[in-house]
């Protein structure tokens, strides 16, 4: 019995030290993190662009669909670090007669709409027509000009003269 009492504390000491020791339950694992850090994308040269369409003479008979007074304008981008593509969306009221064109502000000429296309001929549609943004290649050294052409387009044979202003908002996303 004395041997059993002496053996019991010795076993408890061995058990306690075994429980305190860390145990290896398998090999160590690795966690890999992947991240790309980019500088800010392009900045707009101007938040607002004014295009002077000058005076248009509406000839009779009106030629529906004929582009009048084409005027060049551009959206300027600068400091385009790491951006290779800019996608432009334009939002304005679609013309009720031809929703692929932008409506003029009310209170002026009627039966006339505004057409916007790139210098390469790709038309920019009002975003409310579920159009696809127009893509442009951008270069990260220097200033980029996204070149466009605006023109008035008669959409009705009984178009009337008057003020022909339009407001079109644009947004640019980058990749």
Swiss-Prot record:
It comes from the Bacteria. InterPro entries: Adhesion_dom_fimbrial, Adhesion_dom_fimbrial_sf, Adhesion_dom_sf, Bact_Fimbrial_Adh_Pro. Keywords: Fimbrium, Signal. One of its GO terms (cellular component) is pilus. The keyword Lyase does not apply. It is found in: Fimbrium. Residues 1-20 form the signal peptide. One of its GO terms (biological process) is cell adhesion involved in single-species biofilm formation. Belongs to the fimbrial protein family. This is Protein LpfE. It comes from Salmonella typhimurium (strain LT2 / SGSC1412 / ATCC 700720). The lineage of its organism: Bacteria, Pseudomonadati, Pseudomonadota, Gammaproteobacteria, Enterobacterales.
């Amino acid at each position: 019995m004395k041997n059993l009492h002496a053996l019991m504390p010795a076993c408890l000491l061995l058990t306690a030290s075994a429980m305190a020791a860390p145990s290896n339950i398998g090999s160590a694992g690795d966690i890999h993190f992947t991240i790309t850090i980019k500088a800010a994308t392009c900045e707009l040269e101007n938040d607002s662009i004014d295009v002077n369409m000058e005076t248009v003479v509406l000839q009779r008979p009106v030629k529906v669909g004929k582009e009048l007074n084409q005027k060049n304008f551009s959206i300027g981008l600068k400091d385009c670090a790491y951006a290779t593509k800019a996608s432009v969306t334009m939002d304005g009221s679609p013309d009720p007669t031809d929703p692929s064109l932008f409506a003029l502000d009310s209170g002026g000429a009627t039966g006339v709409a505004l057409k916007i296309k790139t210098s390469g001929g790709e038309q920019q549609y009002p975003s409310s027509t579920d159009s696809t943004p127009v893509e442009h290649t951008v270069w990260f050294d220097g200033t980029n000009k996204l070149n466009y052409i605006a023109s008035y387009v008669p959409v009705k044979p009984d178009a009337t003269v008057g003020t022909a202003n339009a407001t079109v908002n644009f947004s640019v996303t980058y990749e």
